[in-house]
Amino acid sequence: MGILKIEGVTHWSIGVNNLEESEAFYGDLLGLTPMGRLGNSVMSCFNVGDHNILLCEREQPVEIGPEADHRVHHSFTVSPETFVQACKEFDARQIPIADLIYRGQGFFTGRELYFFDPSGNRLELRDPTWSQGMPEPAFEEIVAS
């Protein structure tokens, strides 16, 4: 048990290079609920479930390439249907895909699609209903289905 008792998370922040482009990506494509911009207009709040995500426009754009630390990412839980829909939509929109992983063991099991937002932040869509022994189609096979 820690010294302090944290009662919850107010929000998570994601640094972005272009706030308007990122608002469209997270709101229109990923379907997060827009809550509005903060008073300073360089931060925009989105909600999903019990979580608030704050998009923070960087003062200077940062180039984040696929070679960046792949362990740092934000993960979103989706249904199997949304997972397939996302694969097809990302392919059609040429959203950069990093990896498709089928994780049968560990703390977070399921199938995981890693991709990048317009600012180069690594994101994950996770379908927790997939389990070891189920089919493991490649990304291209899911897109073609």
Residue spans of the language-model regions?
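Conserved beta-strand in the GNAT
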Residues: 54-56, 124
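Vicinal oxygen chelate
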Residues: 1-5, 8-17, 47, 64-89, 92-145, ...
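Residue-level structural signal for beta-strand termini and adjacent loop
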Residues: 40, 58-59, 128
